[in-house]
């Protein structure tokens, strides 16, 4: 009887015991790994499209890349593009309101994000600046076009840049100066082809914040008129200046007048003997640098 009961229990229990199905562990790892591969490819592709100078700077590249990879489709589509449909922030390097477009051989000012405050477009092949280049960019505070081929700047190209404080047009091919925005503190036009007739009589008169004016290595025949009282540094070296009057820096009708802010005037390399114009410097704290005898 006991044998029959054991046999019955065994027969009844065995069918209920089945091997558990194998645990599927590989699938989640596979999909996760595959996602990493795709992300890595995007980062590498984005990295390769950046300028060489930006690639050398690992910090800027990684941060800028991360910001652009996180942007949604609507933000990317809103970015301004060049004729090649390549976003400016891939052609250049955009970071915290600054746009760096240096040494990439562009021939025109690239479309800029509306929040741009600082533009560095040095050492390119830009030949012309148009009114439309900055028509919608009112936040600019600094522009650097040094080392281009700029020959022409349309009238009013900078007229809407009411916040612009620093402008460099050094090492270009300008023969005349554009109308400058009112809040400039620094203007650099060294190493151009500017003659005195290319500067209007009141070009600097209303620039009451202008402290640094660089016009060295041009073709000026005389010192620009109506220089603002705010000037601290004036560079006119290596021009063709042949004459200075008592009203160039001072006021001939006011012997007590002193230019209190002027710290430096450079005039070396001009065909003029400064010793012949002593009265022209009577209001200055320091004599200009140049040839006296």
Swiss-Prot record:
Glycans are attached at residues 60, 240, 253. SUPFAM superfamilies: L domain-like. It is found in: Secreted, Extracellular space, Extracellular matrix. PROSITE patterns: LRR. Residues 1-19 form the signal peptide. The keyword Secreted applies. Its main location: secreted. Keywords: Disulfide bond, Extracellular matrix, Glycoprotein, Growth factor, Leucine-rich repeat, Proteoglycan, Repeat, Secreted, Signal. Pfam families: LRR_1, LRR_8. GO terms for biological process: articular cartilage development; bone development. This is Mimecan. It comes from Coturnix japonica (Japanese quail). The gene is OGN.
């Amino acid at each position: 009887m006991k044998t029959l009961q054991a046999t019955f229990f065994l027969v009844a229990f065995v069918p209920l015991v089945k091997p558990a199905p194998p645990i599927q562990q590989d699938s989640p790892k596979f999909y996760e790994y595959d996602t990493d591969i795709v992300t890595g490819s995007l980062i590498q592709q984005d990295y390769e499209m950046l300028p060489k100078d930006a690639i050398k700077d690992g910090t800027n590249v990684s941060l800028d890349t991360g910001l652009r990879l996180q942007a949604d489709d609507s933000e990317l589509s809103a970015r301004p593009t060049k004729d090649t449909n390549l976003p400016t922030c891939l052609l250049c390097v955009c970071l915290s309101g600054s746009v760096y477009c240096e040494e990439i051989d562009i021939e025109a000012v690239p479309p800029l994000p509306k929040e741009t405050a600082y533009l560095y477009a040095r050492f390119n092949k830009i030949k012309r600046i148009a009114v439309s280049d900055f028509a919608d960019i009112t936040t600019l505070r600094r522009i650097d076009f040094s080392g281009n081929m700029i020959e022409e700047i349309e009238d009013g190209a900078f007229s809407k840049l009411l916040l612009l404080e620093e402008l460099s047009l050094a090492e270009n091919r300008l023969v005349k100066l554009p109308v400058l925005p009112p809040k400039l503190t620094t203007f650099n036009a060294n190493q151009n082809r500017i003659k005195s007739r290319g500067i209007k009589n009141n070009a600097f008169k209303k620039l009451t914040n202008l402290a640094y004016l660089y016009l060295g290595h041009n073709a000026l025949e005389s010192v620009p008129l109506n220089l603002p009282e705010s000037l601290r540094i004036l560079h006119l070296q290596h021009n063709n200046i042949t004459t200075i009057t008592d009203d160039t820096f001072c006021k001939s009708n006011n012997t007590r007048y002193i230019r209190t802010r002027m710290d430096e005037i450079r005039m070396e390399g001009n065909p003029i003997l400064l010793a012949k114009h002593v009265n022209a410097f009577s209001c200055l704290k320091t004599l200009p640098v140049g040839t006296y005898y």
